[in-house]
Amino acid sequence: MRIEPIIQGVVARSAHPFGCEAAIKKQIAFVKNAPQISQGPKRVLILGASSGFGLAARIALTFGGAQADTIGVSFERGPSEKGTGSAGWYNNVFFKREAEKEGRIAINIVGDAFASETRTQVIEAIETYFEGEVDLVIYSLATGMRPISNQPGEFWRSVIKPFGQTVTGASFDLEHDRWIDTTLESATEEEALHTIKVMGGEDWESWIDTLINAESIAQGCQTIAFSYVGPEITHPIYLDGTLGRAKIDLHQTSHSLNLKLANFDGAAYATVCKALVTKASVFIPALSPYLLALYRVMKDEKCHEGCIEQMQRLFATKLYGQDHISVDGERLVRMDDWELAPHIQNKVNQILEEMDANNFQVIGDYQGFKNEFLQLNGFGFDEVDYSQDIDLQTILKLTP
């Protein structure tokens, strides 16, 4: 069978196994040749390890100098007679294969990170493979809903909406390469609460509490979670909306976790990352034109970073091997420093003032945006022969 990219709006319905393998190998090659992580963690738990920042962090810590062993938790779908499965499934498979080639432990736990059974599996894996303790916990779950405790079948569901105003902005239909104007109504307080429950810090704190109670926290253990703030032009839909409320809750959680981990001479940080094309970010209306302009400017200025560049720089220059960890006035680790540089933002704003439905593919980096989206699912790599037939039985044997 031949696997073609199937896109519906901004959702990819297919994944190419060997394109995902190419993506893993490309990221490994980058971190091996980048400035290396020194004094890094050796036993790392990643919650949300199969794509985006979670996967990039796992690759950076394993191959970028720290030589870490990892346990990765993710909720992915394997191949079947009905479909190819998810990209994250293959990312898990090929990451593990490459890590084990270099003698590293790479445990994949495929399950619901909100479920108590998954936590039990994680604790058992830490006991079995990590001598009972972890040195770093990365919280990188990206999901639209979370089960409500003690209410089977009921969920909190996040929404992407502004507050106190309607916001009109553009998103892209990647299937047909179209600009779509979207108007978002103001969120209700209940919608805000649900979004905080799904995307705020409560589950992160619950995981750390579970690990503390299981005596799985090593001396000096740190934990990080990822956030976004963005420039003022993105604030109506992001920082001042439901997503922003959830991220502020995440930031506050980092402070309470920092106090808890102080008992282990450890620390907790919310890490503010750069705006990037991820499976999650393409769903945010009004952010897409900004991404097109930002990609164009940062590539022109030769300071563009993807997830893997961000994570290698985070661990090599911010979190490890330093006399002290550099944070801002709110105790946030800022990986959006290059993005928010005034000369970058001035040029981005100039492009956005001119961008519309007729010229977005010309003045913005639409091809870069779309290709990065395709590469999340294993497509768009020159070294992969996409005309080659793939035997279903072969990929059914690929297990993480």
From Swiss-Prot:
This protein is called Enoyl-[acyl-carrier-protein] reductase [NADH] 2
Q: Where does substrate bind?
A: 228
Site description Plays an important role in discriminating NADH against NADPH, residues in chain? 76
Q: Which reactions appear under catalytic activity for this entry? A: a 2,3-saturated acyl-[ACP] + NAD(+) = a (2E)-enoyl-[ACP] + NADH + H(+)
One record GO biological process: fatty acid biosynthetic process
Positions that bind NAD(+): 48-53, 75-76, 112-113, 141-142, 247, 276-278
What is the scientific name of the source organism?
Answer: Vibrio vulnificus (strain CMCP6)
Q: Which residues form a coiled coil?
A: none
Regarding protein family, the annotation reads: Belongs to the TER reductase family.
Biological role: Involved in the final reduction of the elongation cycle of fatty acid synthesis (FAS II). Catalyzes the reduction of a carbon-carbon double bond in an enoyl moiety that is covalently linked to an acyl carrier protein (ACP).
- What are the alphabetically sorted keywords of the record? Fatty acid biosynthesis, Fatty acid metabolism, Lipid biosynthesis, Lipid metabolism, NAD, Oxidoreductase
The UniProt subunit note reads as follows: Monomer.
Q: Which GO terms describe its molecular function?
A: enoyl-[acyl-carrier-protein] reductase (NADH) activity; NAD binding; trans-2-enoyl-CoA reductase (NADH) activity
Q: Which residues participate directly in catalysis?
A: 238
**This protein's pathway:** Lipid metabolism; fatty acid biosynthesis
